[in-house]
């Protein structure tokens, strides 16, 4: 697989997060995960399924012994935010190129499909930003714990 054609997910553990568009809150969660998703040209449904399964299985919440050993639970929340800048590359200089990012119509369809897949298996509070909008995101990170996932380098 050519490097750069990958579903990119940045997962952050939070105690609270909120996303606003033009001053209005469009998504809010308490304890849970903020997921930034970058969709590239060649991404497939199988990448979305892999990403959803991986996110819901990540054991990054503390158990009773204080060890990261538990996945996100249905009494928590997940806030998904589209972020095409995750698809940027800096192979030529300092200005990111986004030529491998999916076009907005393709990315929106796959973003919606990702939310559908995630929602089937997650019974908690699933919130989103607004696709394509300029957003302000506030979060209280827990840890911090940040996990990088990409569908074509699954060994991460």
Question: PLM features: residue spans?
Answer:
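N-terminal, polar/charged subdomain of small-to-medium soluble alpha/beta proteins
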Residues: 2-94, 109-156
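A charged helix-plus-loop insertion that forms the helical arch/lid used to bind
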Residues: 92-106
């Amino acid at each position: 697989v050519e490097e750069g054609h990958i579903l990119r997910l940045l997962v952050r553990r939070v105690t609270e997060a909120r996303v606003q568009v033009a001053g209005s809150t469009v998504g809010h969660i308490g304890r849970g995960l903020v997921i930034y998703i970058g969709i590239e040209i060649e991404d497939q449904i199988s990448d979305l399924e892999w990403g959803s399964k991986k996110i819901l299985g990540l054991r990054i919440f503390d158990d009773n012994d204080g060890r990261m050993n538990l996945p996100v639970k249905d009494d928590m929340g997940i806030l998904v935010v589209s972020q095409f800048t995750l698809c940027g590359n800096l192979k030529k200089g300092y200005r990111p190129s986004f030529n491998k990012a999916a076009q907005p119509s393709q990315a929106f369809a796959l973003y919606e499909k990702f939310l559908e897949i995630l929602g089937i298996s997650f019974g908690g509070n699933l919130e989103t930003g607004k696709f394509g909008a300029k957003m302000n995101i506030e979060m209280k990170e827990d840890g911090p714990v940040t996990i990088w996932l990409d569908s074509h380098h699954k060994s991460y």
